[in-house]
Amino acid sequence: FPHQLYQLYTAQPIETKPYRTEIYCRKLSSDLRWLEAVARKDADPRLVTIPGLGDAMKDLLKVFSPRHYFDAQSLSDLRPGLVDLWQIVRSYTDRLSGVYRETQFRNGIIKRSRYSLIGDRLSTASHILFLCYGNINRSAVAHALAEKRIPDAGQYFFKSAGFHPLGNRPADPRMAAIAAAEGVSMDHLRSSVLTTELTEWADIIFVMEADHVKQLSTFSQAAADKALLLGGLLADQSATEIPDPYNKSQPVYQSVYRTIDQCISGLSKLVC
């Protein structure tokens, strides 16, 4: 091709060779990403048809066909292929390191949210903040349950908030209906946006997910250090994260309500 460019530039007749047909060019890194996406089913089935893993493997085995060529790996020039392989190894190494760090972080949050340790923290706490993303489902129902289940003796004060930037929203009607059926009213609650003042007010911040601790750290490390998983109040098991039910099925809403109800019962046993 460079020689043809030279011929074109110097107005010489361009020498061409017949094109080979039915030749397929592949890229190893793209093939590996595709195989991983198929194995994970990492696509919206409404938009694409996800092949079976067997079909994907059959397609990958075509690399041994003489009609299939890698665009980077070539015996005539090893350098592009080696660069591509290095980028593949570095990409997977970075991802595995990230997964390891994330696992260690989550395990640390779970460890410090053990039921017995929460009891120790509560002995010196009076201001308790419940926190989730929107403050219309999980933290809101925890707030309502805590106000109902834990006697107001002036020792404990409860608030709730969320990371969602829009405040003053009523509780999710579906969660409010489930709570009302159990004799718990959420009608008086309106969502609050988390502020630095709220993080400073709280002695303990009960979060629903480990990622909420990361978000808290953007306010201050002191705020993140106050965070515990609400799921740590399940006395008969290790601390667990509580998923967001928003826009999910009714059974998910009911399951989340039951879990939070059990957590507040655990809190009540520790403080009453």
Language-model-detected regions and their locations in the chain:
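Peripheral (often C-terminal) accessory segments that flank ATP-dependent C-N-forming ligase machineries
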Residues: 7-102
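Conserved active-site segments centered on acidic
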Residues: 105-201, 272
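Short beta-strand scaffold positions
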Residues: 130, 207-208
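Phosphate-binding/catalytic loops
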Residues: 100-122, 210, 214-272
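Short clusters of hydrophobic/aromatic residues that line enzyme substrate/ligand-binding pockets
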Residues: 25, 186, 194, 242, ...
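Conserved metal-phosphate-binding beta-hairpin within the catalytic cores
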Residues: 1
